[in-house]
Amino acid sequence: MTSARWLVRRGIALVLALAGAATTGQTLPDKSKDKTLGVVNCASSLCHGSIGAWNGSPVLQNEYVVWSRLDKHARAYQLLRNEKSRRIAANLALPQPAHQSGICLDCHAHNPTTPAAAPHALADGISCEGCHGPAERWIAPHTAPGASHRGNIANGLYPTDQPLARARLCLSCHFGTSDKYVTHRIMAAGHPRLSFEMETFTNLQPAHFKVDADYLQRKGNFDGVKIWAIGQAVAVATQVDILLDPKRGRDGVFPELTLFDCHACHHPMADTRWKPHTAFGKSISPGLVRLNASGMLMLRLILRQTDAALGERFVQAVLQLNQAVAGSGDITERALAVKALADEAAKKIAGTGVSNDNLRGMALALVDDGLGGAYADYAGAEQAAMALGSVVNTLHKLGQLPSAANLNQGLANLRAGLVKDEAYAPADFQARLRAFRPLVAAPLAKP
């Protein structure tokens, strides 16, 4: 690639970064100019450090206790002191150990760019302010009489309740940004493969909030399918951001390989998985590394159910991007087209959501796409299984699917086919999907 092309891409990267910030109008917590004050300011028993939840309070007031005792984010820093982290740091020849290296601390702790003095401590891991934003401006007024959630956000509180903002925040570590990213080199040094789906991961964390009437009045309600769909759209846009970023999108003469399907390379030579067609049309040539299309597969399916015209434009844009990756076409132009459509989809879903009338069709499409061969790669199957969990759970809550026990057993059977990514067998996963389909297709018995 010529230096002139790199200069163009540097300008594009800046535009993309600014566009990402504009999506929510809020700076990510680690980039805020406000001062971080430390967890201790939240931990009083009269604030958020109560052993048990309070009755009659607008918040539970035991948030610190739940986080510190049960949430893995609180222990993220401690992982940097274990043997695996020491080995990764040594393999990367880092000048400092993992627990002192910014490349690790940026996602294993709240490591703000604005200097933070004690009592803030990196050892607190992903602390309160790591998600809710540095508290310099909002900590005093947020407890004052008449304080509002909107006012707190204006004072720097990060709006984690809003799916678009939450997706940007979570993906900044669980996928990456131009400033912090788990590269192929870091994975080769021993870091686990990253996987993320916003609705599933949100529910896996111990909730330090209760969605009651007061919560709904202050923050609104977002169903799981909407959160899942927005997360997928933002993930696709984030992937394209990294692909285009001159700092993160390449590593020497190679592209950044974590953006591509891991198992296109990491499988036995005798296991020939290349197919002439994919969900996005004619496949690129054998022997070429494929983009990780797992998020794109999910967004394609979502748009087919919510906006067919936008969905068709997205399919064509991804097909053209894949062709550009193979050397036919301008990759920058085509990647920007995919990002623009993903951003459009995220905003549309945030505004209108997903109709309950489309949910059963969406669940069936998740299954039928797999039966049609769309999940030839592990990452696609993994996302489909998590998506089915979100959609089926919502359908059951709506009374449109019976027997929670059977549904849970069916979902567990799907997950059992995904325990080891290296052992993933597409035909086996298809068989599991085939067994699951009747649970989704069966009409409710009439009373």
Question: What are these language model-derived features?
Answer:
Residues 2-14:
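Bacterial N-terminal signal peptides that target proteins for export
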Residues 19-24:
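N-terminal signal peptide c-region/cleavage motif recognized by signal peptidases
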Residues 27-29, 51-90, 119-127, 134-382:
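Primarily the internal scaffold of c-type cytochrome electron-transfer domains
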Residues 39, 44, 109, 125, ...:
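Aromatic-flanked redox-active Cys/Sec active sites in thiol-based oxidoreductases
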Residues 40-48, 105, 129, 171, ...:
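Cys/His/Pro-rich metal-binding microdomains
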Residues 90-129:
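Post-signal peptide N-terminal segment of secreted/secretory-pathway proteins
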